């Protein structure tokens, strides 16, 4: 699925040809939102045949409000606006029902200061190398339809020193992204949270910090990790779907609160869109996750928000390493994009512009109720099942 050519500064202003919602680009030949393009793909891939609820095939309204009410009429509308079935059939799908292969990311080398390697005590930096192995997450048991593939990238090997060896894909296998079905956004969000925690535990440098530091870093960074996950795994963020998921509407929610939630959802859409426009690869996402995770330990806090990390020196050093690694990787992988590193770093503050309470309200309220998300994070991280 490709984005339209030309200016992409406000791609979401182009309406979806199916339901009229803001589109996220061209999908199967027409401008469409994530919800309608995903519905069309699932329907064609699974060869679904729907029956109109009203018995009047094509007579049901298909707009932002009613698009999920009748699948038969929605599919008919997709075909009427010339969504291309062949484009779906010819897309390369997953090789298995779930992704079983992990993409291993290898990071080597130390940060060099004035030509010499900077050393830390065993208590300051538990591991001798930076991120000896960072495993890209497995999408276990995600009952989701594949939406796109990441083109196979040439293995990065044999790079001249002092440039370190950068991430490569195991066996050259491409990474497949999965669509998170709009009918189960809450479940998908819970899985994404689980995946983020599993990712953190897979980073040796992170897991060797004290448990207290690990939990505090997660509590501070879970929002950024979650939004990065939305951008990476293409979870639908159209307002009507998220409002339906949260159960909020004009009848049961006061206008000020509803308007605030809608505004936050729009901000989330903008942030996710900006990341997707840059078409980050798996390595860049991994580096950014490390940066935002360790940034929580070195950010300037004030007043009661001051966090007392036991190993602040190690956390600061690891964040520096993450930035240096990303910078070197981009210079090697994208030599014709000298501003790419700066653009990615400038996007990071936007991740914190989304209120954590909004994410909890929209994505997790039905799942965890009034249980604080920090408690869920702590329980999940301590679980031996992850």
Swiss-Prot record:
A family per Pfam: Hormone_recep
InterPro entries from the UniProt entry: NHR-like_dom_sf, Nucl_hrmn_rcpt_lig-bd, Nuclear_hormone_rcpt_NR2, Nuclear_hrmn_rcpt, Znf_hrmn_rcpt, Znf_NHR/GATA
Record's subcellular location: Nucleus
Positions of NR C4-type zinc fingers: 16-36, 52-78
One GO location term (cellular component): nucleus
Keyword Transcription regulation appears in the UniProt entry: yes
Assembly and interaction partners: Monomer.
Protein name as catalogued: Nuclear receptor subfamily 2 group E member 1
Organism field: Xenopus laevis
